[in-house]
Amino acid sequence: ALGGVIHYYTKSPIIKGSEKIKSSFTTNYTSANQGVSNNLVTNYSSENWGSITSLSISKFGDIKMGEKREHGFNSWGLTPLYSENSRYSYYPEASINSDENIQKNTGYSQVDLFQKFLIKLGETNLLNVNIQFSESSDIDRYDQLSITNAGSLKFSEWYYGPQKRFLISPSLRIFPNRKFMKKGAITFGFQKINESRIKRKFNALNRSHQIEDLKVFSLNGDFDTSFNNGHSISYGVESTYNYNYSKAYDQTLEIEGNQVTGLGEKFAIPTRYPSDGSSYSSFASYLNWSWNMSEFFTFNVGARLTFTGLKAS
């Protein structure tokens, strides 16, 4: 088996930049789903601190697949039937798709806000504060809404409710320039994630909701040093704590014509995860030694020790 890490970096503010304020705007359009994405970025740079702000607004329509079907599976990926049901509309029967190449119920929209501050502390130390927020519209599950039962669709509704994510992560970068600690970073992180799964079958008025409220805490310390003879050492510790609270319930739709005019009282159903809450925690430490033996050879050896805990009820 192969292992690896995909490490994403977000843009960072600049201190003492050549321009005090710099902004840019980009927009993208995709014809396959009539999607439009707009992004506005503003940078501010001063003598002792910098800021970068990014706002993205995206809206995507239903995906249209290619019409040339040379793979031999003539009906694969086509959408002959679809559901017009939503939070606020009610249709007792599946609808016929006038263009089967359009994958109905694949469109959604999303807003993303990204803010970073970089603050100089003293002569060498830096404080980086990373703040992110994102929220989506309802996101339909195309695969579930395509399942058939006795010649018709099984589900009239199956979608993720608006997904919300908030993150704040301050990171202190230090440069003590000592023998066993030339530089290091101490990073705290907190995320709050809300998601839900809502579904209802055709010929049924009960709409089920499964709602998750997840909180994630993390604390990392990473340090390294190097020596003149080609040797370098990196070491650190990490602690994480994840807590999820789940709830689930059914509600009966109150309808008038094709409109959902109200919802009945909630009654409990099985939750997706333990209903009294569940948590996962970990603590880990690592040590890595690297030796650049020559221009062509590098020797690495490392060790990591991890403790984990799981609690659910």
Regions found by a protein language model. Give the residues of each.
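Exposed loop/turn and edge beta-strand positions of beta-sandwich/beta-sheet ligand-binding modules
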Residues: 2, 19-21, 36, 111, ...
